[in-house]
């Protein structure tokens, strides 16, 4: 599936002038296929650069003047493709980007980004070692990590920038527990390691609950102030940051020195629907089939036609990120109308009932998620039918399908 994404997304700019492109995988093939290969795409994503820009601008309008924005581009920009979106990030003057993997960091740097690059999860020593040339600011939450990175810094002859993670937000995955004397001692030891330069202190909140955030924010402020005093860190040299998309917008006092928006930029923040999704998931009709009443459809014969029916075969299945559980529940859009998925979704095929839809022909566009004419398939609809949260869907889409970037 990566092969498919590489071929199509590399060639789209040469054949469709209204699109710009970036390859879906981070390690891409430079060979350009012919136009016929583009037409062989069974499913694809359309990413709206205009909506991405609009979401960024709207988000920026709610930030304090002195609050820096660090755009979180982990999971290859939430499945939307780092390489395709970085030109917009740069044009918008975003000073910081957050990533998870070295491949993502390299894609950011190769886009021409010269700003601050932060890893937003704990990394192994081998990851950190192989990323020294990328100038990543690492997230440190244990004494051992600090020792390992300090030794790496010494060997490389560099002073490495780090952000200390505290567990005051209650996430329990990266940070130091500051409620114990042992935890406080560990934090001071990290902050005073030679060859490491502490440039930030952070935490992360696990819930969409403003009152809970405010209570934990107070604890973070107390912990970070204590740590800076004990480790002789200068306040003006430390970036304090705790706010993800939800917190930045709904608890403005938590914006502090920097915010870390992720989902909101891509249109995935359930509490703030005023930020539309930038992605659509599409396929096309591959064939039409006329079945008589009482015909069964799909594996396990879970659907039986109640009338003479016209069924459309769609060349997309769970291997492309359209889950098996969509069967007999979900709907898709064809000719601006809803068509019910019948039978369970197969690995590479989905069947929909188009008996009541006029003018359906092979090759016509089908919207699996997104809008078509006056109809739309919403996030909540996808989640309910798939029995998955939306990020589990779109991150899989991004690894399984070519991306077309629409102005």
UniProtKB/Swiss-Prot annotation:
**Compartments reported by the entry:** Periplasm
Variant or mutagenesis effect after changing residue 25 to E:
Completely abolishes the catalytic activity towards Ala and Met and dramatically impairs (70% reduction) activity towards Arg
Database matches in Pfam families: Ala_racemase_C (PF00842), Ala_racemase_N (PF01168)
Coiled-coil regions in this chain? none
Write the record's keywords in alphabetical order, separated by commas.
Answer: Disulfide bond, Isomerase, Periplasm, Pyridoxal phosphate, Signal
- GO (cellular component) term, any one: periplasmic space
PROSITE patterns, per the entry? ALANINE_RACEMASE
Listed as disulfide-bonded, the cysteine pairs are 70-96
Q: Which domain of life is it from?
A: Bacteria
Explain the purpose of this protein. Answer: Amino-acid racemase able to utilize a broad range of substrates. Reversibly racemizes ten of the 19 natural chiral amino acids known, including both non-beta-branched aliphatic amino acids (Ala, Leu, Met, Ser, Cys, Gln and Asn) and positively charged amino acids (His, Lys and Arg). Among these substrates, is the most efficient with lysine and arginine. Is also able to catalyze the racemization of several amino acids that are not typically incorporated into proteins such as ornithine and norleucine.
Q: Which HAMAP family match?
A: Bsr_racemase
Name of the protein: Broad specificity amino-acid racemase
Q: Which gene encodes it?
A: bsrV
């Amino acid at each position: 599936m990566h092969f498919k994404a590489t071929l199509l997304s590399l060639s789209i700019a040469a054949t469709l002038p209204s699109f710009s492109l970036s390859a879906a995988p981070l390690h891409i093939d430079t060979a350009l296929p012919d136009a016929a290969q583009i037409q062989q795409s069974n499913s694809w994503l359309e990413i709206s650069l205009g909506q991405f820009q609009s979401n960024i601008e709207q988000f920026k309008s709610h930030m304090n003047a002195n609050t820096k924005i660090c755009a979180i581009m982990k999971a290859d920009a939430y499945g939307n493709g780092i390489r395709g979106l970085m030109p917009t990030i740069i044009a918008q003057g975003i000073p910081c980007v957050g990533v998870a993997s070295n491949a993502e960091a390299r894609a950011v740097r190769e886009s021409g980004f010269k700003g601050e690059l932060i890893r937003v999860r704990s990394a192994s020593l081998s990851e950190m070692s192989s990323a020294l040339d990328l100038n990543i600011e690492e997230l440190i939450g244990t004494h051992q990590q600090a020792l390992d990175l300090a030794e790496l810094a010494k060997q490389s002859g560099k002073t490495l920038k780090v952000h200390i993670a505290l567990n005051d937000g209650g996430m329990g995955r990266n940070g130091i527990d500051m409620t114990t004397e042992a935890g406080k001692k560990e934090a001071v030891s990290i902050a005073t390691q030679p060859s490491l330069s502490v440039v930030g202190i952070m935490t992360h909140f696990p819930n969409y609950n403003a009152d809970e955030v405010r209570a934990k924010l107070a604890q973070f402020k107390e912990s970070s102030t204590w740590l800076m005093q004990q480790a002789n860190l200068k306040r003006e040299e430390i970036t304090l940051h705790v706010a993800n998309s939800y917190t930045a917008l709904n608890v403005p006092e938590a914006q502090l020195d920097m915010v870390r928006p992720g989902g909101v930029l891509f249109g995935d923040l359930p509490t703030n629907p005023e930020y539309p999704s930038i992605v659509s998931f599409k396929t096309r009709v591959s064939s039409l089939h006329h079945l008589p009443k009482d015909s069964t459809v799909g594996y396990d014969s879970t659907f039986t036609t109640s009338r003479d029916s016209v069924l459309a075969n769609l060349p997309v299945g769970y291997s492309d990120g359209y889950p098996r559980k969509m069967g007999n529940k979900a709907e898709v859009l064809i000719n601006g109308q809803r068509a019910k998925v019948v039978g369970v979704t197969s690995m590479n095929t989905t069947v929909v009932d188009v008996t009541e839809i006029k003018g359906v022909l092979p090759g016509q566009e089908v919207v699996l998620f997104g809008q078509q004419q006056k109809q739309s398939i919403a996030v909540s609809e996808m989640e309910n039918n798939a029995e998955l949260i939306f990020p589990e869907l779109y991150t899989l889409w991004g690894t399984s399908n070519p991306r077309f970037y629409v102005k």
